């Protein structure tokens, strides 16, 4: 079995429906990167006061996004938890519909880890790196904007569930055919952070910093 837990609260704050779909899709990507196929999920919904119309809308749209995502990956929600009224005098927390998804690895030989294995191996990027129509080139709702520019703004990446499902199926096929030694999903921090994380091996951690240029 494999387990993934994901949610980008900033993306959900800016677009609850797309952000919630993306949380499900990221779980499925992480499972695929481990060599697993999704079989079920559970949620942990953390929101503010639902009597506030805007916050209730966040909850409603998030649940709609989770439902579409789980249906797309055939990962039914078997249970969950809801926590409301999460706020202080300054306002409510960012809506955080955290998803946990479990997957099945049919053959132990297909268990896949994230780090690079051998010098000279080819690095392949599956999927489009950024939406060509995005004026912020993928930076909408990013930690870059929030930390360096103190802005919670922009349009987070759109989540095409059909594309995500195809990506997962393709990756699993590559893993099961023995063509992939390691896999890691590209999420918070973008490609640079993903590549850096792929350098961290539990076996050779002391040697990996030299790979980071």
Each language-model region and where it sits:
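Glycine/proline-enriched, intrinsically flexible loops and inter-domain linkers
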Residues: 1-213
């Amino acid at each position: 079995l494999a387990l993934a837990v994901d949610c980008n609260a900033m993306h959900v704050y800016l677009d609850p429906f797309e952000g919630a779909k993306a949380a499900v899709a990221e779980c499925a990507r992480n499972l695929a990167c481990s060599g697993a196929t999704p079989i079920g999920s559970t949620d942990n919904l953390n929101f503010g006061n639902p009597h506030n119309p805007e916050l209730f809308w966040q909850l409603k749209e998030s649940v709609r996004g989770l439902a579409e995502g789980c249906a797309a990956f055939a990962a039914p929600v078997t249970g969950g938890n809801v926590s409301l009224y999460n706020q202080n005098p300054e306002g409510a927390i960012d809506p955080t519909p955290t998803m946990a998804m479990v997957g099945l690895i049919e053959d132990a030989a297909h268990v896949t880890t994230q780090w690079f294995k051998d010098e000279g191996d080819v690095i392949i990027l599956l999927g489009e790196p950024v939406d060509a129509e995005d004026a912020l080139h993928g930076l909408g709702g990013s930690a870059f904007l929030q930390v360096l520019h103190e802005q919670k703004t922009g349009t987070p990446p759109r989540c095409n569930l059909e594309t995500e499902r195809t990506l997962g199926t393709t990756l699993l096929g590559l893993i099961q055919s023995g063509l992939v030694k390691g896999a890691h999903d590209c999420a918070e921090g973008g490609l640079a952070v993903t590549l850096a994380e792929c350098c961290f091996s539990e076996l050779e951690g002391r040697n990996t910093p030299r790979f980071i240029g």
